């Protein structure tokens, strides 16, 4: 049986250590109460006194059904998890003397990656003495970024790292949303 972290996060009823608490809830006047009166009010309503913000002075407590409260918190956390999108980085490799057809083919793929909402990391790989053509590689990557200007924005300009010259492009947010709605 796994332990529920969410239940350990909140103190309820007699676990609350403060002498005074600010009470909020649907059926309660919002103000500061002594802990004994707040517990009595929760008992009369057959609900729990839940410490929501223990760091506040005085701590904020809510009169609510504890099981329902935990359920709502879990539901809220799941919704937040769904909203977080995983960032996927697609890589495209060029050589320093990439032909026009190869370039257009890779450009087409990069456009589709950016439309899907993925980042694109394009790099020119220099082998042996081809490192002498690093200016050509930089020109190629800048042209690549310029051709993808409508689909994404440059996140990192071309940098030489070892035998690779790398550029990173991120999708434009507004463009992604409008393209997804069209489908």
Swiss-Prot record:
GO biological process assignments: ribosome disassembly
Top-rank taxon, per record: Bacteria
Compartments, as annotated in UniProt: Cytoplasm
Pfam families reported in the protein's UniProt record: IF3_C, IF3_N
Main location: cytoplasm
Signal sequence segment: none
Gene Ontology annotations for the cellular component aspect, listed alphabetically: cytosol; membrane
Keywords: Cytoplasm, Initiation factor, Protein biosynthesis
GO molecular function: ribosome binding; translation initiation factor activity
Classification via NCBIfam families: infC
Subunit structure: Monomer.
Family under the similarity heading: Belongs to the IF-3 family.
Function: IF-3 binds to the 30S ribosomal subunit and shifts the equilibrium between 70S ribosomes and their 50S and 30S subunits in favor of the free subunits, thus enhancing the availability of 30S subunits on which protein synthesis initiation begins.
Protein name, per record: Translation initiation factor IF-3
Species assigned in the record: Azobacteroides pseudotrichonymphae genomovar. CFP2
Lineage, opening ranks: Bacteria, Pseudomonadati, Bacteroidota, Bacteroidia, Bacteroidales
